[in-house]
């Protein structure tokens, strides 16, 4: 309608990486000569590898709500833009919410992080460890290997340890499996909360009504904006 972005035609080049960091780097190297405007890796692991390359090449990386959290320091990471939120924000917001839910104190509570065993999934761990020391809750991190279809041992561990709350940094099929496994062990769904990549409708559909009460963080606008009306 507008002849492109500000009147400039933009061609979108896609690469199938299978969430594989090496393939993502290969994609970057093979396409950067096309006159790249910006790259969106959609992978924290790829983002870490591409930051020095893109910085040297003068090409921006847009990692919206993912990637290297410390890249929000623009004085150091001049070519990386990770607004509007990052994983440290997400961990902090989740803990603040849980603190409010527990009457203003997390002292002595047990909070478990179920995370995708990748650079992405590990991003919130230092923040949660620091917040555990600050607020007095017991923190444990449990890894789930990609793609996440096998989680029985992790959820048996959760059933044994009975944490007060479970946070999830999941991805793809891992989310569906985790929510179903939580239902299988009768974990209180109202005490289970995911990051924004674990909050799609398809994540809760397989568990049906058993997923009622599950929550997820969100940074996307949910009300009507003029630009959304124009797109419609």
What feature does the model see in each segment?
Residues 31-44, 62-65, 110-115, 162-172, ...:
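Periplasmic-binding protein-like
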Residues 3-73, 83, 144-151, 176:
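Beta-alpha junction/loop-to-helix N-cap segments that form part of ligand/metal-binding clefts
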Residues 69-70, 78-185, 224-230:
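Extracellular/periplasmic Venus flytrap/periplasmic-binding protein
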Residues 26-27, 49-53, 127, 154, ...:
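A short acidic, amphipathic alpha-helical/loop segment
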Residues 57-59, 137, 187-191:
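A short helix->loop->beta-strand "cap" motif at the edges of active sites that frequently abuts
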